[in-house]
Amino acid sequence: MANPLSYRLKKCFDRYIHDPIAALLAIPLFLFLKILPYNLSSYLCGILMLTIAPLTSYNKRVKRHMKIVFPKKSSMEIDKLAREHWFMLGQTIGEMPHINKLINLGRLKTEGLEKINKGPAILVGAHMGNWEFLGRVGDLAGRRAGYVFRPVNNWVLNKIQIHRNKDANADFYRKGRLAAIGMAGKLKAGEVVGLTGDQLLREGIMVPFFGIDTPTPQAAAIMS
């Protein structure tokens, strides 16, 4: 069945109007943060996120999820945790332009690198703390790893992200069939692969997560 006209119009609007405009707003901000000291960039983004995010509908979702995880905490405690969450997320965004600098300054602490010095290995990460560091773990161990990534919804920003990943000394595979082939090839060659285990899924196996059946990726378990 052909896509309806409204869908095609939205795709054209996003590609030629929405995405370029959003990128034009995001790129100067990224460059501005990059010229700031990393600690100031981190703090400013933390404050900005803490100021704006609680006013959005996402804040209700965050608090709803926290009540599932911490059912015994009071509403006041949940509010405090939500504010801390938004501040930390803002800090993470503020640190993204400074990934290389933070690594060179020794601000990234890694444990267990000796376990992946040789032979095949599977790295499993999550969107906790500064998740972009996962893409550098293989390089820190002296290995050229392969990582699965989910493209940014904005095609302009996605191209910029791919360019940024060139600093990681790694191979990146877009989520899908080709990623599975690339990762399998890496492991068969005795190399390192990595993926995040908490990406939005509509497939996978259903696993109870805090009492709620949740679609869960099984790629790492299958490959191992």
Segment roles from a protein language model:
Residues A2-G125, N130, K159-I162, D167-N169:
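Membrane-anchoring hydrophobic helices of lipid-metabolizing enzymes
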Residues I68, M223-S224:
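Short basic/hydrophobic patches in alpha-helices and adjacent helix-turn junctions
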Residues T92, M96-M223:
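Soluble catalytic domains of membrane acyltransferases
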